């Protein structure tokens, strides 16, 4: 891990896709965060459905990736992941500077969760830290207004999940709601979406779906025991530098212990 003085030098410049333009406006404003009318288009589409792999194929695929460049992942992937990446290629838009691959091979017992939250959220949010954020009483803020008001800058994503027993849920219709311009976490957004209860869909087994940084989705608990391969492809202008905490959390299965 580089010393603190060098970490700032390693940080890539902020690209327009990730620029917290709303936060910039708070430099001379009171410390109360305003609300706005947020519209989530929820551009979720099923792009292809592949043959459902066997549990042995998933278990034995062997290699997982964390923010890995697409070309490298394609070279080094196991047989199943390689088939998925080849199937994703025709659906890449090719308008961003970087294409990254994340994958997980996880074994779930019924009730296990693939990530640390089942909140409704969006991927690739604009995250801000620093003195301006601290002046508003937080260590971190997601600039939701900046993302939603500049949809053309959003990252583009593809996702694959192999199995029936643990499927991501996606909202399938546009959703409008009033929310803070800047949020420290997705708790309030999750509550608002659950209250609205919009139509949503579980990603079909062994399907590839497309969505973007304005698409509400959430993890669900596994309904049964078994292996699952999950693959996410993100096209973004943001250059990612991995840190040990990011690597360590990937692939963790979250389980509620009996009381």
Map each language-model feature to its residues.
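Intrinsically disordered, low-complexity proline-rich regions
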Residues: 2-3
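Non-heme Fe(II) oxygenase catalytic core, chiefly the N-lobe of the double-stranded beta-helix
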Residues: 13-205, 213-226, 233-245
